[in-house]
């Protein structure tokens, strides 16, 4: 058995849009309304009616942090979530020094890993 020590990935590019829900903008939100803050890659749900507060980055009295957007579920440290797309999924990670790669909870026909060096 080989044990892989995970590294924190906070940013990458992907062909999957972050359009799970409308983007948060200042305003009044109804109970159970969901929105995203793309800069955080998070989905929030309003916990009260006529909610005028902004999501705080965590669950508070006004907003529940539901989880990562579809595009970022792949790195949310939860095996039970999946990034889903009809067709190919492409991820491009910044320069990493790594000797191992793991794909967990994956349903696909094939996986292609391409390692590139920029000159």
Description of each model-found segment:
Residues 1-76:
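Tryptophan-rich substrate-binding surfaces of secreted polymer-degrading and adhesive proteins
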Residues 11, 15-18, 38-39, 68-119:
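Aromatic, loop-rich ligand-recognition surfaces of beta-strand-rich domains
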């Amino acid at each position: 058995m080989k044990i892989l020590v995970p590294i924190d990935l906070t940013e990458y590019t992907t062909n999957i849009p972050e359009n799970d829900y409308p983007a948060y903008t200042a305003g009044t939100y109804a109970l159970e309304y969901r929105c995203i803050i793309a800069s955080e890659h998070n989905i929030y749900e309003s916990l009260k009616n006529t909610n005028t507060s902004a999501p705080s980055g965590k669950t508070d009295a006004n907003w529940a942090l539901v989880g990562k957007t579809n595009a970022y579920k792949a790195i949310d440290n939860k095996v039970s979530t999946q990034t889903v797309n009809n067709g190919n999924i492409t991820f491009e990670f910044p320069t990493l020094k790594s000797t191992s790669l793991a794909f967990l909870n994956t349903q696909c026909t094939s996986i292609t890993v391409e390692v590139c060096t920029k000159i």
